[in-house]
Amino acid sequence: GGCRYFLGGCSEHSDCCEHLRCKMGLNYCAWDGTF
């Protein structure tokens, strides 16, 4: 359970915590530009 934090590994956006999204191809969570 739980969400992935900044630079955490991911396979889709829903893996990442709020305000983060999965960078496709690089497979880590990055800030999505929102607050």
From Swiss-Prot:
GO terms for molecular function: ion channel inhibitor activity; sodium channel regulator activity; toxin activity. Expressed by the venom gland. The modification Phenylalanine amide is found at residue 35. It comes from Poecilotheria metallica (Metallic blue ornamental tree spider). The presence of a 'disulfide through disulfide knot' structurally defines this protein as a knottin. Belongs to the neurotoxin 10 (Hwtx-1) family. 62 (Vatx) subfamily. Pfam families: Toxin_12 (PF07740). Gating-modifier toxin with weak activity on Nav1.7/SCN9A and Nav1.8/SCN10A. Inhibits Nav1.7/SCN9A peak current (IC(50)=334 nM) and shifts the voltage dependence of activation to more depolarised membrane potentials. Shows 21% peak current inhibition (at 10 uM) on Nav1.8/SCN10A sodium channels. Its main location: secreted. Disulfide bonds join 3-17, 10-22, 16-29. Negative results: does not show activity on TRPV1. This is Mu-theraphotoxin-Pm1a. Keywords: Amidation, Disulfide bond, Ion channel impairing toxin, Knottin, Neurotoxin, Secreted, Toxin, Voltage-gated sodium channel impairing toxin. One of its GO terms (cellular component) is extracellular region.
